[in-house]
From Swiss-Prot:
Pfam families: MinC_C, MinC_N
Gene source species: Agrobacterium fabrum (strain C58 / ATCC 33970) (Agrobacterium tumefaciens (strain C58))
Family (UniProt): Belongs to the MinC family.
Quaternary structure note: Interacts with MinD and FtsZ.
Keyword Metal-binding found: no
GO biological process: cell morphogenesis; division septum assembly; regulation of cell division; regulation of cell septum assembly
Alphabetical list of InterPro entries matching this protein: CAP/MinC_C, MinC, MinC_C_sf, MinC_N, Septum_form_inhib_MinC_C
Classification lineage: Bacteria, Pseudomonadati, Pseudomonadota, Alphaproteobacteria, Hyphomicrobiales
Name the record gives this protein: Probable septum site-determining protein MinC
Annotated keywords: Cell cycle, Cell division, Septation
Function recorded in the entry: Cell division inhibitor that blocks the formation of polar Z ring septums. Rapidly oscillates between the poles of the cell to destabilize FtsZ filaments that have formed before they mature into polar Z rings. Prevents FtsZ polymerization.
Amino acid sequence: MTKVLTDQRSIRIKGRSFLAVVLSPESPVDQWLERLDDLAARSAGFFLSRPVVLDVSELSLDKAGLKELLAALRERNVGIMGIEGVRPSMIEPGMPPSLKGGKPASDVEVEPVAVAAELPEDKPHASGEVRAVVQSLVINEPVRSGQSIMFPEGDVTVIGSVASGAEIIAGGSVHIYGALRGRAMAGSLGNVSARIFCRKLEAELLAIDGVYKVAEDIDDKLRGQPVQLWLENDTIKAAKLG
């Protein structure tokens, strides 16, 4: 008996981009894992339910070394969705897939509410690319605990406070017109010029271009004060505003 197909409906396959945290281990790996443990201990839940890409381009790993690293991360409940900087031949069944060419992209159109000036001409990008404008996303209300605001295209401004357990992730700078009690990550896609500004600093975690500082690292003199933070020689610097 021959089955006749009278309804030929296609299967829709969509391409979509998501913002993920990228972990870039450094040698020696044991010491890097200790620093990762320190971050996880001082910022509980940072990796919980968060997509993570493992970039091993700075390491010289064989297949066994890669498996050991993945096992060490699984023990720490860090779920790896993909691996960057690895030869496809090193990927075995059951391992996360090999990724390459990651770049920011938006799945949801966000209306730009402000446009900043062009980047200075005397500081061109090494790749020769020219970013014409930097967009800004303005949140006109406080950010509640458990909320996560991600805007890789540019700056994020919050007219209000950011509660403990909430987070702001921006490709550019972060401006908080209120108390910053949660997490703020600026320059998330690689922007050493990004800054963090807030009217009251009580943050759980701060990060600029991948360099982080947790609550215990903040100078007591700056707690509860209006503060700006910036990156200098791979170190986060902070100063009181006004």
